[in-house]
């Protein structure tokens, strides 16, 4: 993370992830899951883990009394991972009150099943959207609950893109916790349609990160980062588009394309 702020990420040849991406997303990051070799065993482990955590923790620690309600909410949230969370949409889909949805979302955050990413608020710009994004805590868990395998995931590019962004956010949260300076993970979106997947913030200094499910990148992909650079002003340190390539490429002033493997492996 500190290298991202200093624009000092090592310039070298990185490895392509390519066809390894789908299996990587399906496997997720839990140590017990990483050790599983059989896809069916992997899915079973994730489902058992999910059931154990939600039923035990909801009943005995959170004392909410209804683990099935939490299960239903989490399944829908996992399907919307990386998106702005529409609480009213969840409430309508499940027939729950808005208050109940908010209570169970807070519970899912306490159980570390969901990561809440707040919105970045530029000091001099008022057209930003304040809604947070929510990410599944682990791509393997989210995909196991929907029975995705390697073949079906490759056929759903939109889902792969969502899960890739979620995996990047998970990794950045880990790196941020070890950074030399206190670092928060936020996101940016405004009413003009510009958005940045991740905004790393150290004090007032910010770095923008976009995640792209592609092996190529161009300066036109940097429109969100350029808007962030404008609204953040002198606080903007650098912007990166993560892509499945081999080299770091400068696209614009303080904006670079950076291989995914620099973050994920």
Q: What does each of the following model-derived ranges do?
A:
Residues 201, 208-216:
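Active-site ExK catalytic segment of metal-dependent nucleases
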Residues 177-178, 227-235:
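Arginine/glycine-rich "motif VI" loop of SF2 helicases in the C-terminal RecA-like domain
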Residues 144, 218-219, 248-252:
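Switch/connector loops and helix/strand junctions flanking conserved nucleotide-binding motifs
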Residues 215-225:
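Active-site-adjacent loop/helix micro-motif of nuclease/hydrolase catalytic cores
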Residues 34-206:
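Accessory nucleic acid-recognition modules appended to NTPase machines
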Residues 244-265:
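Domain-level recognition of nuclease-like catalytic cores that cleave nucleotide substrates
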Residues 189, 212, 242-243:
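Short beta-strand/turn micro-motifs composed of small residues
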Residues 4-51:
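Amphipathic alpha-helical "lid/sensor" segments that cap RecA-like P-loop NTPase cores
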